[in-house]
Amino acid sequence: QISKAHQNPAFYMDVLKNKCKYQNIIVDTYWNPGSDNGRPELFTPSFRLDLFFLGYKKGLRNHDGVSLEERFGEFPDNLPDYVEWVKTWIIRKKNAGCVALKIALAYERDLHFEQVTQEQAERVFRVKESDITQEDIRYFQNYLFWKICEIAAELSLPLQCHTGMGQITNTNILQLNNVIKSNPETKFVLLHCGFPWLDDLFPMVDGYQNVYPDLTWVPLLSYTASNRVLHQLIEMSQIDKICWGCDTWTVEESYGSLLAFRFSLCKVLTEKIEDGYLSVSNAKDIIDKILFDNAEKLYL
């Protein structure tokens, strides 16, 4: 039955549009960053920038086997021009329809991006390739991350940051504190709410107006964690910021992810109504905001 369904070219869009009732999907085509999957009527791209963090050396490939040169062409070999080149690509992708930037470096490194000087960051371009150290690479990547935060603010593009799961060491949300604090005009979307280190999320959303908690993937990872985050964010009056996404590959997974989140959200709201914390009208308003209004306001 599954095989038969997949033979129908209309199956995928039917599930997404008619079963999931999606009106717009923010898509991350990391194998071809910034693409709308050829379906602009439903998919709106986020532009993943991870490849640009490989620009300290020619010929590098990421863990998916994709190279910076193959996707974006030859790049400058000095820091000021390189940063400007990255900005040019971001502007180009925004003009082509991208509504957000995304960084998922937590799969490759920690999320503590110290602020470094241009002199420290450009050393990676000055030394022989054989002499490049891990410290040189880190300085370059840290510098670029801060510049991207500035560009995101300048171009009014939310910056989605994968947090939590990945290479695990120091990928919790608090590692981003210095960057978020120093870039108040940049909208930071904290994907996955830092799971499993959820407690980091709450002081950040309470302390910074430019932080947006996104429960993408969380209900699939842990129904209990999803419930807990929703309970606490509602009690902290963060209702206007909460977003959700499926973070899946297949339409079956997307539908299942939606069911999981609906179940979690309804469970939490039912408990809040029974406790007298919310009215039914309040709960309906929260549903509209989390499943539609907040994302529309943030991205579109």
Q: Across the structure, where does each feature detected by a protein language model lie?
A:
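Short hydrophobic/aromatic-enriched beta-strand-loop microsegments
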Residues: 45, 211-216
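Histidine/acidic residue-rich metal-binding segments in metalloenzymes
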Residues: 78-103, 110-211, 225-243, 260-261, ...
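Mid-domain alpha/beta scaffold segments of enzyme catalytic cores
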Residues: 1-143, 151
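Active-site beta-loop-alpha junctions enriched in small/polar residues
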Residues: 30, 48-54, 104-108, 164-166, ...
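Family-specific functional microsites
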Residues: 252
